[in-house]
Amino acid sequence: MNPTISPVGDSAISIEFGQVIDPKINQRIRQTVASIESLHLEGIVEMVPTYCALLIQYDALRYTYAELCRILEPICTQPMSADESELLTVVEIPTVYGGEFGPDLGFVASHNHLTEADVVSIHSGTDYLVYMMGFIPGFTYLGGMDPRIATPRLSSPRTHIPAGSVGIAGEQTGTYPSDSPGGWQIIGRTPVSMYDESREQAALLKAGDYVRYVPIDESAFHCIKKLGSSFKPVVHHVKAGDLRGGK
């Protein structure tokens, strides 16, 4: 479908590229962001990519809605480039599965008629696309989880989920960047800080990155935890065809 542009209040617009969660749609959104950034337009306050749309906040004293639409329409309708040599960023997230770190691993396994080892193997066998950021600072909305481990949310959310907890809700998976309430099924925990305001880029991940969960043991967890912000996760740069899980 052709992108549709619509106003959001008096100083923002939404560009909708589709109505389904799809990596190609999300790639088009990211390419649109890059194209707009290359213009260095004064008055663009912020661009927020979502699953299927791009929200652009702008200075209403600089542009009218109609003026901005005239600038953006040619960019939004240009064909998406299909560079097969493009390298994608894959960030390894070391994770302890099960036990006190993943109290719901057993339920996820039994719900799907699998062993706990099966769940760990399936969950860590896919590279997950970061579609967008939201909910709380540093939280990533990931796509690509294998439906074989899909599990409903908890019927009663917990009042406290520790930072770094890795969870499953429906066909989604993700990592809690900070302590918070939550209703996801917790299957593990990472010692890596997903959000740290002392870093130049506070959030470890950004839209367009891929996450690769790597199983570790409890000893490795505590070693990495002690390193704190000095620990640097392993980062791979791979072609699309080399992603795990084929997503």
Residue ranges and their predicted role:
Residues M1-K247:
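Glycine-rich active-site loops that engage anionic ligands at enzyme catalytic sites
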